[in-house]
């Protein structure tokens, strides 16, 4: 059976080497996010200040996979 993952929205705070990013979730948690393969293949640029959807494992809540970059009109600010 596949592992259940939690999907959160957050803001990219800092860009780190090797496609890693520091992300502040909407619930104020600070986690380390990495870019999913689909985003990497599509050459989608993620920059500090972007809002993203991030998939977090139940077992390790300090790391997550960035699965979607929200456009300005998609964010609920």
UniProtKB/Swiss-Prot annotation:
InterPro entries in alphabetical order: NA-bd_OB-fold, RNA-binding_domain_S1_IF1, S1_domain, TIF_IF1
Ranges for domain S1-like: 1-71
Coiled coil: none
Principal location: plastid
Pfam families according to UniProt: eIF-1a
Cellular compartment(s): Plastid, Chloroplast
Organism domain of life: Eukaryota
Keywords: Chloroplast, Initiation factor, Plastid, Protein biosynthesis, RNA-binding, rRNA-binding
GO molecular function: ribosome binding; rRNA binding; translation initiation factor activity
Signal peptide: none
Gene Ontology, cellular component aspect: chloroplast; cytosol
CDD domains: S1_IF1 (cd04451)
PANTHER family registered for this protein in UniProt: TRANSLATION INITIATION FACTOR IF-1, CHLOROPLASTIC
Role, per record: One of the essential components for the initiation of protein synthesis. Stabilizes the binding of IF-2 and IF-3 on the 30S subunit to which N-formylmethionyl-tRNA(fMet) subsequently binds. Helps modulate mRNA selection, yielding the 30S pre-initiation complex (PIC). Upon addition of the 50S ribosomal subunit IF-1, IF-2 and IF-3 are released leaving the mature 70S translation initiation complex.
Subunit structure: Component of the 30S ribosomal translation pre-initiation complex which assembles on the 30S ribosome in the order IF-2 and IF-3, IF-1 and N-formylmethionyl-tRNA(fMet); mRNA recruitment can occur at any time during PIC assembly.
Family: Belongs to the IF-1 family.
Protein name: Translation initiation factor IF-1, chloroplastic
């Amino acid at each position: 059976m596949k592992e259940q993952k939690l999907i959160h929205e957050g803001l990219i705070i800092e860009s780190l080497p090797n496609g890693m990013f520091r992300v502040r979730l909407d619930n104020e948690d600070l986690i380390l996010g990495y870019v999913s393969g689909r985003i990497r293949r599509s050459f989608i640029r993620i920059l500090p200040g972007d809002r993203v959807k991030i998939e977090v494992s139940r077992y390790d809540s300090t790391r997550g996979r960035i699965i979607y970059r929200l456009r300005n009109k998609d964010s609920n600010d």
